[in-house]
From Swiss-Prot:
GO terms for cellular component: extracellular region. CDD domains: CLECT_REG-1_like (cd03594). This is C-type lectin APL. The lineage of its organism: Eukaryota, Metazoa, Chordata, Craniata, Vertebrata. It is found in: Secreted. Beta-galactoside lectin that agglutinates rabbit and human erythrocytes in a calcium-dependent fashion (MHC is 0.21 ug/ml on rabbit erythrocytes). Galactose (15 mM), lactose (20 mM), rhamnose (20 mM) and EGTA strongly inhibit this activity. Disulfide bonds join 3-14, 31-131, 38-133, 106-123.
Length: 135
């Protein structure tokens, strides 16, 4: 694996939690600037989401929720990944997504679920975030 030592290697990609609190779009911009081809993280299997949850539980300092790369760009309940990968796996927390007050269009990992389940959230909320890169 070619991942730097504090990144999680998985399926040919590398993942890292950043504890700095940012709004969703700023977090995506940060990941993209980190290295070409980087994005907020995407997930495609239950196994991946468990491994990520374990990694975040081990390395995340603080209690903040964690942004991932899923968003409802068109605001029409069509969730998509910023890396344009296939939206083939969704693991929402119960009663989510609810697009509460028609304002929640970005997706976070919920700390109370051990970072295993997802919630839609107001994109301007400040969260920690998970970048995914190829090195």
């Amino acid at each position: 694996n070619n991942c730097p030592h504090d990144w999680l290697p998985m399926n040919g990609l590398c993942y890292k939690i950043f504890d700095e609190l940012k709004a969703w779009e700023d977090a995506e911009r940060f990941c993209r600037k980190y290295k070409p081809g980087c994005h907020l993280a995407s997930f495609h299997t239950y196994g991946e989401s468990l491994e990520i949850a374990e990694y975040i539980s081990d390395y995340h300092k603080g209690q903040a929720e964690v942004w991932i790369g899923l968003w409802d760009k068109k605001k029409d309940f069509s969730w998509e990944w910023t890396d344009r990968s296939c939206t083939d796996y969704l693991t929402w927390d119960k009663n989510q997504p609810d697009v509460y007050q028609n304002k929640e269009f970005c997706v976070e990992l919920v700390s109370l679920t051990g970072y295993r389940l997802w919630n839609d959230q107001v994109c301007e909320s400040k969260n920690a975030f998970l970048c995914q890169c190829k090195f």
